[in-house]
Amino acid sequence: MDPAAGLTALAYASGVTVALMVAIYVCSHLLLRYGLVPLSAAFSFSGFNVPLFYLLILPGTVVHELSHVLACLMTGVHVRDVRLFSPQANGVVGWVTHDTADPLRRGLIALAPFLGGSVAIYALIRFVLPPTEVDPLTSQPVDLALGFKAAAATIVGIVRSSNLHEPKTWFGLYLLFSLGYAVAPSRQDLHHLVAGGLMVIGLIMSVIVIDGWFQLRLMQNGLINNAAANVAVALQHLNALLMLACAGIALGTAVIVPVAVLSYWLRRSLAAR
């Protein structure tokens, strides 16, 4: 048995987590820029339908900001001001201001929408859209490709079994699009995540160098590896949620972007006549 198995599992699970977060971030911004924005422009007589755009992003924005609030409460950071949905002229639609925190807690607060949005998408799929036998909270995907393939198959199966004649189905898809937009971090959140991530990487590299230089054999320590294995299991559950969220956002992007672009093109063509 590999004496560093726990740390190896943790390193792999962490890599999967980062890969999924990057994928969610990319899909979320594609959904916003090439889906929700063109769709709002297509159904407008004045260039851009602001009320429709706000309606599309409302649920997701509320979940995004609530995730920050809950993270502040759980980490003991005092919240100064909360606006769950308050569109401003500069493009900001919601915010949470809090006291200054250390890099670790600041990073956890910035990460909160990933978890909050993924949990919201999970709840949506379990309780609003047609039921599925796959439960991400009880699954532990080890392989990234197989895990994402299973999550995508779950989402596609749900859509295929949906009754498009029921308002509940369209309401569920609307929430899926909105939540997909809001799962990704904002620019300020991303700044905190990058700063915190670089600090963590620097700390890990320092420990590895010190361990190798002084032959401390920390990588083979049983207690450290057991703790790392437990953290890896927790990350695998998180990755299951992130995979489901990523698959849902990817599907939403694949559906709404062509519709939005086509609608916008038709509107421009009709307006030019």
What are these regions (language model features)?
Residues 2-37, 89-270:
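Metalloprotease/metallohydrolase-associated module, dominated by Zn2+-dependent proteases
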Residues 32-102:
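Small-residue-rich helix-interface/hinge motifs
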Residues 273:
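Active-site glycine/GP-rich loop and adjacent strand/helix microenvironment
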